[in-house]
Amino acid sequence: MILAARSICLAVVLIGAQPAIASDNPSWLNKQMTFKQARRAILRAGWQPIRSDDRDHDYGVVSALHHKGVKEITQCSEGESFCNFYYRKQNECLRLITIGEQLPALKVYDWTSECPDE
């Protein structure tokens, strides 16, 4: 009985230690936004860009955005150019996914509460 009670207490402590996740449907973010609009809304809502590793920014859309000061970009696929941007607010993470090949044309495709691999 004592062992079971300790296990439950340990489970509660471990669950409580998990980082919180971003709201799946923030009212200030929608799929009709351009990346610039979404980024502005994200920063206004108190999120901070998670700076990515500079060594991975030597080509295409990633390089162009990184040189424009968008340091939170982590990667873009080739072809339709889906790009990932990461933000943090306290213990929460927000991953913004865009589609497009140039900054003015980048549109919000989706978002998740994923944190980048660290």
Describe the function of each predicted region:
Residues 23-39:
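Short N-terminal segments immediately surrounding and downstream of signal-peptide cleavage
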Residues 34-51:
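Amphipathic alpha-helical segments
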Residues 90-100:
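Low-complexity, intrinsically disordered Gly/Pro/Thr-rich segments
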